[in-house]
Amino acid sequence: MGRTPCCEKVGLKRGRWTAEEDQLLANYIAEHGEGSWRSLPKNAGLLRCGKSCRLRWINYLRADVKRGNISKEEEDIIIKLHATLGNRWSLIASHLPGRTDNEIKNYWNSHLSRQIHTYRRKYTAGPDDTAIAIDMSKLQSADRRRGGRTPGRPPKASASRTKQADADQPGGEAKGPAAAASSPRHSDVVNPGPNQPNSSSGSTGTAEEEGPSSEDASGPWVLEPIELGDLVWGEADSEMDALMPIGPGGTTRLPSKGLARSAARPRWTTCSTWTGMASRPICGAGRSRTSTARSCGRPPSRWKLLLLLLLRRRPAPRTIASWRRSRLGSCPTRSDGSGHRTDQTDQIIGSRVLARSLPSRGSWFRWPNNWEKNSTARAVKPPPCAPDVDACRVELLRI
């Protein structure tokens, strides 16, 4: 419902003020002060509402109210302040001593608003114009009362757009080594081929400098620390990246520290092995968790955790062999120097390329009885007298 306006009360006088009422109001305020405007009319003996008494006193009866017409200089100040502040008549009146906000508003609406366009064409800003100093403390205090934004503070949308524009600039300054080391979630693509030396200087490169041919020849190596219980995989705590198989019977040594960072995002090779492992339960681990294979980007975190659990557990060899035989039937094959036919697939475990060129049938894993954190993966070429193994077998051995 709200409070009933005081002017609607029965018996109150409305309309023009008489000289006797002005005298009663001026004498009471001179003796007792303004006080409460709601109780002032009754105490002063006036049949007026409190709002009418307040407006009459502030706009007409005060001693510091300036009488007479508004001068030409005051018009210039009003126009310039209105162009800066808008319809904030109280702030404009604070720069014109003796003039009330109501008087300035009425003068603007009745005279200046009609002549503003002619005035702007006639009076252009020149070097001899008098500058108007705006009291910023009053402006900020008025903003706090009205709930406006403090001057000088940009909106959130503009700030976010500015940050996005700075991030999208290709010619921006490169981040320092401290900033690069503060984000361990971002992986590095390391390709120690002839086109890119293994240097520890931390120099950056581009995708065009690396070339796609070297990556296809040796495969993508992605280094990213992973922690699961007491098993920690990383650049400093793991030796899993020490030996990287590149084919039947061959290994490549990778540096564990001081790897060159690349500006390109890590690219993951999608093959039938990845798709099969991502769409089927992992070696009968008890729970069927699946993830979607992607041709670009980083594999899901749950995919890494499941593969780490696969290393820690000891599944039956027949499960892996049967699963490998069923999932690798459509993989492309090649023939190496020894006459064995192997599959060009990548076995990715815990964001590491564990082994390549796994056989399509008859493959088996030999798991150690006691798993240690410091372990490595080796690709051992099978002897010629082993007809049941086509190309190689992966052994996890203790150091």
Swiss-Prot record:
InterPro entries cross-referenced by the UniProt entry: Homeodomain-like_sf, Myb-rel_proteinP/Y1_C, Myb_dom, Myb_TF_plants, SANT/Myb
Biological process according to GO: regulation of DNA-templated transcription
Record has Kinase as a keyword: no
Pfam families found in the cross-reference section: Myb_DNA-binding (PF00249), P_C (PF06640)
Compartments where located: Nucleus
GO CC terms of this entry: nucleus
Feature: DNA-binding region: 37-61, 89-112
Annotated segments matching region Disordered: 138-222, 242-262
Residue ranges of every copy of the HTH myb-type domain listed in the record: 9-61, 62-116
A GO molecular-function annotation: cis-regulatory region sequence-specific DNA binding
SMART domains the record matches: SANT
Gene3D superfamilies, per database record: Homeodomain-like (1.10.10.60)
Keywords of the record: DNA-binding, Nucleus, Repeat, Transcription, Transcription regulation
Low complexity biased stretches: 170-184, 191-206
Function: Transcription factor postulated to regulate the biosynthetic pathway of a flavonoid-derived pigment in certain floral tissues.
Protein name: Myb-related protein P
Organism annotation: Zea mays (Maize)
